[in-house]
Amino acid sequence: MKDLSLTLENLDEAFPSEFTQEQLAKAKTIFLKKLSEDAHCFYQGKIQTVAKAPVVGFNWFNVWYTPGVSKVSTKIRDNNDCSFELSNRGNLVAVVSDSTRVLGDGDCTPPGGLGVMEGKAFLMKYLGGVDGVALCIDSRDKDGRHNPDKIIDFVKMCQYSFGAVNLEDISQPNCFKVLDVLREECEIPVWHDDAQGTACVTLAGVINALKLAGKKISDVRIVLYGAGASNTTIARLLITDGADPAKMVLFDTKGALHSGRDDIKADARFYRKWELCEHTNPTHILTMDDAMKGADILISLSTPGPDVIKGEWVKSMADRSIVFACANPVPEIYPYAAKEAGAYIVATGRGDFPNQVNNSIGFPGILKGALMVRARKITDNMAIAAAHSLAEYAEKRGIHIDDIVPNMEEAAVFPYEAADVAMQAIADGVARVTLTREEAFQKAKKDIEHARCLTRSLMDKGFIDMPPADMIRKALDFAIGQVKG
């Protein structure tokens, strides 16, 4: 055991050396949850409002507020597009959730999603130079049922204060209707990160994993375990980017998706799943045992693990198999177990394991790119462009089986990705503003550097306290004690 650094970079070495791989994985999960709870309590959340304009003297309040600000109001009244230039709207994202599917914890009640939504805004700012506001709402109707129309109405009413909307942690099937309606009826881009963001980064991982495995996307057999918002969107983007739907099988809680699933066909709310029933699994494979035999890729976004994905399934896969076990907060199978079962490349959604396939490397750059050109929507082409941008960036700096996509520490990836997304928005005809790629790249780079410098300055000057070492030590001791029993 070594002393744990404040950066947590030597976390594995801070646990007893006699811990097995399984004990270590369990201990890290317990530690991170305990430290998260204590740190959130210590800081009282993660986000605050900081002024971006100077207070040269109190007379300037007559400029920033009344009477001077009246001119701003009337100018926006006469041309609503001026709101993007005369306010922070052009760089502001609403992070909207009804908290009905928070990570793997289910319905956490409206305020229960605040930790995740603030976290989203936190990452947007530091990684993408984008301001975010957490908005957790109650979507229940008078009968107590969660009604997607309540979310739709809320977003449509508040869209005029924001440059984009990030939907988060909305349970299915409501999430499908909410996204599809808002994408068409809002004047600003609406992005569902659980679906589109996860799909974008997963596609990036698949692109580079296939390069390392020496396989083509059009040739491989793909199994998707779980058929929620994430995996259904992943399937759609994979097919759009060249995967063969006839070589693809998806599973939900009732079994494999295929054209004989009358239960899905009969429920109009699950129209996205039915589309996949019609186009995938033409031979009506019914079981995971059969689907996994000879499969090249497994993408699992289902129930938090471990032991949700069986080692026997992985053993039956093709040579140089690829396993993405991306449930949060615990993957369906731990990486060490998947490797022991013969997987060539393993990815999870967690940053403390190799190959973090997590939307944290996607949404900051994607939203920044959309905002810079004032896009009206984020198209599937823009998401696919972001995936290829991430894969290309990683390949240029070098990839290997434990490093297939960029990570959050690679600051340069975000302006690179943002610029590619902006260019695709222009190509798709959804941009209000035209920039060159270099202009987009430089603007994103400047804004991201500014956001990081601001945070570091607040830390250096003591306006943001460092985490107490004792708090970290207590969380570590707690985790070790829980595992040792």
Can you name each region flagged by the protein language model?
Residues S83-R89, K125-L127, M157-Q159, R183-E184, ...:
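Solvent-exposed alpha-helices and their adjacent loops that cap or buttress functional pockets
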